[in-house]
Amino acid sequence: LISFLWYAIYNQDNPNIYQYNEFGERMLNNFTLPQMITYLLITLVTTQLIFGSSSSFDNVSEDIKEGNIAMQLIKPINYRIRLLSNSFGSMLGTFFIIVIPISTIEIVTLGSIFGFGKLFFSFNWYNILFGFISAIISLIIYDTLDFIIAQLTFFTGASFGLYLLKASIIEFLSGSLIPLAFFPSWAQSFINFLPFAGIISIPNLILMG
């Protein structure tokens, strides 16, 4: 649905809202329609891979609410490293069980509609390699934010509201909902000082070249 929404946006009758590249293609904030569809496709995959893999928020908040945090901390294993290792294990499982099937369906569906060559205009081995490395770094950033925010359960006594607040802020500021290029320039300058862009936006742009 989001893909077709952007398709409608790029096909408005008012040509004055667009820029044009050297090939005469319509652009919004330096994104052509195929580039935007590609960004959305990659975003769906990376959000599943990153957001669906981190379990630190749930684990920490549950340990705090159930009073098990003290027992976890005195065990002869680093609590933070154990949580991060769990997230990496989940990331590996998510990649094979969810990401590969979703990617296949997306490629076949959107590629048949908009054209395979246009969607994957800049994929090459080094973009994929550095994109994979950036995805690992993204998981570390996101998992660390999960770990820090979950500790607020000490003061709130409940975690559901914290989870909704965290999810809303991160999805909005990470480029998961819309590319950060569509934000005002002053907002982009502010967001660049925050870690959120490194979760979704930067890995996506690396993959796109």
Could you describe each region identified by the protein language model?
Residues 45-56, 136-151, 172-177:
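Transmembrane alpha-helical segments that form the membrane-embedded catalytic/substrate-channel core
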Residues 112, 147-207:
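Transmembrane helix segments
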Residues 36-103:
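Hydrophobic alpha-helical transmembrane segments of multi-pass membrane transport proteins
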Residues 3-12, 24, 100-119, 182, ...:
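Transmembrane alpha-helix termini and helix-breaking/packing motifs in multi-pass membrane transporters
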Residues 32-39, 123, 127, 131, ...:
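Residue-level signature of transmembrane alpha-helical entry/exit and packing/kink sites
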Residues 8, 56-63, 68, 144-151, ...:
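Membrane-spanning helices that line or support transport/gating and their immediate boundary helices
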Residues 91-159, 163:
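Alpha-helical transmembrane segments and their short interhelical loops
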Residues 2-48, 52:
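Transmembrane helix-boundary elements of multi-pass transport/secretion proteins
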